[in-house]
Regions:
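FAD-binding core/adjacent interface of flavoenzyme oxidoreductases
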Residues: 1-7, 75-148, 230, 256-264
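Beta1-alpha1 glycine-rich phosphate/pyrophosphate-binding loop at the start
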Residues: 5-59, 149, 158-183, 253
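Residue-level detector of alpha-helix initiation sites
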Residues: 13-14, 118, 157-158, 280-281
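A conserved FAD-binding loop/helix module that cradles the flavin
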Residues: 20-21, 160-164, 276-313
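FAD-site-proximal beta/loop scaffold in flavoenzymes
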Residues: 128-144, 237-287, 295
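Active-site glycine-rich loop that binds ribose-phosphate moieties when present
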Residues: 132-139, 152-163, 183-187
């Protein structure tokens, strides 16, 4: 059994739900397929989103799902295993969550809003604390951990920039060079770190010290322990764009990873195939991802409208 839609949105995060909201309000028959693995699930709260500052991510998504339902958008919890482009897009699902148990849905336009995955450095204890007292973004978490003892785990020379940035939220900052050699720091780096009062510690980090479910320190491979309450890291952002590449979308290398080539609206090099949110480029914050989804949704409605008008001429 197959189902036909005007638009299928793959991914039910901020970008996907925003695109679906616009399309639903434009009276487009839209399906959202969500696998239920949001990037910010480890975080207790999301920050910096006007009117939603401090809201738990799960609550934010629940509100978004309720909003799109008001406009007739269908949402199913399933996983896309494949998609093929012919006269339209045929999207095959893993669990058969479509009405009637169908596993294949068709659409004229396809939006991929599958986001990205944070790949943490291989240090014992990081994953368990990530989103709590191991964090990556001062704009997302800085206020909540302000004035505590910060550590910054260096994995590239760009970690110097991160260490300097977080001094806005605490004056007690230690940069653990970890896998970055002292010789990789420039004279300008060293002068800026000194001016900011950042303590620089050479040596590789072995693991974290945790007491009573709170980070209390960072342990180096030589057994030295430095008391720290918060550790900033720079995960490798891995875009979840396999579906786009399988459908033939061209990609480009960026400082933040390999992303699809898109125009200002999110349209890829494949007609009818769109990318939104962190699948379209490094959006980072939830509000930016939502904005890209909104923009793609509005553009898709226009594409469909004028395609129908041209066909009627």
């Amino acid at each position: 059994m197959t189902e036909k839609y005007e638009v299928i949105v793959v991914g039910g995060g901020a970008a996907g739900l925003s695109a679906a909201l616009v399309l639903g309000r434009a009276r487009r028959r839209t399906l959202v397929v969500d696998a239920g693995r949001p990037r910010n699930a480890p975080a207790a709260h999301m920050q910096g989103y006007l009117s939603r500052d401090g809201m738990p991510p799960a609550e934010f998504l629940a509100a978004g799902r309720a909003e799109i339902a008001r406009y007739g958008v269908e949402l199913i919890h399933d996983r896309v295993v494949d998609a093929v482009r012919g006269e339209d897009f045929a999207v095959r699902l893993a669990e058969g969550a479509l009405p009637g148990g169908g596993r294949t849905a068709h659409a004229r336009q396809l939006v991929v809003a599958t986001g990205l995955k944070d790949e943490l450095p291989p240090v014992a204890g990081l994953a368990e604390r990530f989103g709590r007292d191991v964090v990556h973004c001062p704009y997302c978490h800085g206020w909540e951990v302000r004035d505590q003892a910060f550590g910054v785990l260096a994995t590239t020379p760009m970690s110097v920039h991160q260490a300097l940035m977080v001094t806005q939220w605490s004056k007690d900052v230690t940069l653990f060079l970890h896998t970055v050699g002292e010789e990789e720091l420039t004279d300008e780096d060293l002068r800026r770190l000194a001016a900011a009062g950042v303590h620089v510690v050479p040596g590789e980090v072995a693991d974290l010290v945790v007491e009573d479910d709170r980070l209390t320190g960072v342990r180096l491979t030589d057994s030295r322990v430095y008391d720290r309450e918060v550790l900033f890291v720079a995960p490798r952002a891995v875009p979840q764009t396999d579906l786009l590449t399988r459908l033939g979308a061209e990609t480009t290398e960026t400082p933040f990873g390999t992303y699809p080539v898109v125009d200002g609206r999110g349209l890829t090099t494949v007609p009818g195939l769109w990318a939104a949110g962190n699948a379209s480029g490094f959006a980072e914050q939830v509000v930016n991802a939502a904005s890209r989804g909104y923009r793609a949704g509005a553009a898709i409605n226009g594409e469909l409208l004028f395609a129908d008008l041209d066909a009627a001429l």
